Amino acid sequence: MKLPDKLGPIHFIGIGGIGMSGIAEVMHNLGYTVQGSDASDNANVRRLAEKGMRTFVGHDAKNVEEAALVVVSTAIRRDNPELQAARERRLPVVRRAEMLAELMRFKSCVAIAGTHGKTTTTSLVATLLDAGNLDPTVINGGIINAYGTNARMGAGEWMVVEADESDGTFLKLPADVAIVTNIDPEHLDHFGSFDAIKDAFRRFIDNIPFYGFAVMCIDHPVVQDLVGHIEDRRIITYGENPQADVRLIDVDLRGGQSRFRVMIRDRRPGYRMEMEDLVLPMPGKHNALNATAALAVAHELGVKPDAIRQALAGFGGVKRRFTRTGEWNGATIFDDYGHHPVEIKAVLKAARASTEHGVIAVVQPHRYTRLQSLFDDFCTCFNDADTVIVAPVYAAGEQPIEGFDRDSLVAGLRSRGHRDARALERPEELAGIIADLAKPGDYVVCLGAGTITQWAYALPDELTARGR
């Protein structure tokens, strides 16, 4: 039995979330009656309302009076008044991943998983399949700049989705093709141990049907080890590793973009193809690797090399992934979602490779538990920044943990040899600090998953208002 064509109103609790909003938009485009609520009137809520969906700001039992079905994410607490009202009425309550899985049954699906790089890789796969006239449906964990949204309804056979591993629900997704970019210790609050995370990724690959395949980055030692434990499924490896089936070669990161070539060597004897003069208008070797994963999938699905080359060169990027927010006095300000030490290190390395001048990092640590569990890594991931400005921790609903806060991180950076780590008392002071520090040609990179994105977009105007 498939998802019925006709359902009563489908109510999304937390419809403004990046994952929920994408599913809601696709279901609306399929002709379902979609409504939803969110705690705040954010950009996603406004976008969905403009598309004709009924939205509520705030959670209230009255919001589900007309609903026939309720969709929730794991972020919604059991005492949410709308969830309680739905259960009192015995309405079906569906988890976000379960609803995404239902949508995926309509199509052949590419699912992108990994601790880092999922959103950019999902966007790149969608872009390359689009260039090959495959017209994919897309549900992403970030706003794709070319679409102006994180979701797109296509008429083709394929669907491209970001597979969120944070709560383990990615194991519900019926993927035909899977990408694994990397596997690092993250979301330990859910999994309990790194071994449990690695086991979840193994099961994710094992779930692929016999006619599908997995694309896996063997530059990452944990992923390479996982490849050795996968049996009876087709694996295509990628990376700079000389043993990769799809090998990234001659990466040049100068000028704020990535130039490279890729060699494809199938396990079939004698098959070899090279794609040269590839340009991605994003800096960073991590982004060149993401592009290589997308290229591997596109090539396997029949997209021509010239179409791949043109699509990569025209890639418009993803919101909050090394996004330029403006300039001041010759210095460029960027906004980036990076909030894990591996992500921060990769972004700052990309910044360092893209400018011959200084790099100033502004970081808002996200969650006390993450800072605690990865503290040593946080203290050593800022080496490519000349100056690190540390804001107070964005709690995301958590209680403070003694010894793991802004001042602890500043002290940890200094004790491990960083020459210029300093604390930010209040966001209002940031413009003054940057005005004193930044010189023409410098990059100012704002990092974090909290409210720092608002600071990054406000900073150019605030600096201009101060004069030069």
From Swiss-Prot:
Recorded catalytic activity of this chain's protein: UDP-N-acetyl-alpha-D-muramate + L-alanine + ATP = UDP-N-acetyl-alpha-D-muramoyl-L-alanine + ADP + phosphate + H(+)
Keyword Cytoplasm assigned: yes
EC code(s) of this entry: 6.3.2.8
Any one biological process term the GO annotation gives: regulation of cell shape
Enzyme class per UniProt: ligase
Residues engaged in binding ATP: 114-120
Pathway: Cell wall biogenesis; peptidoglycan biosynthesis
Keywords: ATP-binding, Cell cycle, Cell division, Cell shape, Cell wall biogenesis/degradation, Cytoplasm, Ligase, Nucleotide-binding, Peptidoglycan synthesis
Compartments, record wording: Cytoplasm
A matching Pfam family: Mur_ligase
Major place of residence: cytoplasm
Any single Gene Ontology cellular-component annotation: cytoplasm
Transmembrane segments annotated in the record for this chain: none
Molecular function GO labels: ATP binding; UDP-N-acetylmuramate-L-alanine ligase activity
Signal peptide bounds: none
Highest taxon above the source species: Bacteria
Family (UniProt): Belongs to the MurCDEF family.
Protein function: Cell wall formation.
Protein name: UDP-N-acetylmuramate--L-alanine ligase
Protein source organism: Methylobacterium radiotolerans (strain ATCC 27329 / DSM 1819 / JCM 2831 / NBRC 15690 / NCIMB 10815 / 0-1)
